[in-house]
Amino acid sequence: SHDEPSESSEPCCDSCDCTKSIPPECHCANIRLNSCHSACKSCICTRSMPGKCRCLDTDDFCYKPCESMDKD
């Protein structure tokens, strides 16, 4: 097994919602195939093939958008 995180597992989020509270409570609605990003503590996946997974973590920030990861 290799512990190197793949590029695709870097934490990122394209659809992040935050409450207006202080501190904000943010969660990501992104669906990823087969796994959640590497920083996700609470990940749920459907039983389909491939599994559609989303991270249920609540943070006080949003991760950077995933689309921007391909280009500098």
From Swiss-Prot:
GO cellular component: extracellular region
Domain of life: Eukaryota
Site (Reactive bond for trypsin): K20, S21, R47, S48
One Gene Ontology molecular-function label: serine-type endopeptidase inhibitor activity
Keyword annotations from UniProtKB, A to Z: Disulfide bond, Protease inhibitor, Serine protease inhibitor
Alphabetical list of CDD domains matching this protein: BBI
PROSITE patterns: BOWMAN_BIRK
Keyword Disulfide bond: yes
Pfam families in alphabetical order: Bowman-Birk_leg
SS bonds (residue pairs): C12-C66, C13-C28, C16-C62, C18-C26, C36-C43, C40-C55, C45-C53
More details: Functionally this inhibitor is unusual in that it stoichiometrically inhibits trypsin in a molar ratio of 1:2.
Family, per entry: Belongs to the Bowman-Birk serine protease inhibitor family.
Protein name: Bowman-Birk type trypsin inhibitor
Lineage: Eukaryota, Viridiplantae, Streptophyta, Embryophyta, Tracheophyta
